[in-house]
């Protein structure tokens, strides 16, 4: 899913409980292929990833509070977002990659250099976004988009590629400059609701089907 400004979606994350028991809700609708699991050394987080044809959904949790709240990692607000995922913080994050060489985000960023990346590489986090909005982060070092089509075939459900991402936000506060710029670029849309909700559109939506995973996960899938 590519927007204007040379950016494209790499993945979306949602904060979840330890070891991602919420995977069962995804499996129940047919997204039941084996998830890719990893730990982020030195960052204190772990994940389980469910692939679509062109991107993936990352369920992420904190497994080491000390690492996640360390001086290196604390500015990412991963701990703050995870700890308050049910009490006001937006539990989502939008991971971006360049679609064209030299592309950069259309908003101010700051570099996060976790220990699991080689020296000189960074993940560029959006500056000035509130916890009530999703985390935005850009990975300039990523190469060509991975082809997940074969992995996606392991699901009973064949939803196709992710074609749209909409995040509903509570309240009436105007969007931060970063989120407004990302919406203008066509990568993600924002709506309003009583609670945070991630809406993922898949394929051509020809099946006309929808799955609301709430309250287990604040996610609605359309395909």
Please provide the spans of the model-predicted regions.
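Conserved catalytic-core motifs of GNAT/GCN5-like acyltransferases
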Residues: 33-41
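Glyoxalase I/VOC metalloenzyme domain signal
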Residues: 2-9, 14-32, 44, 51-223
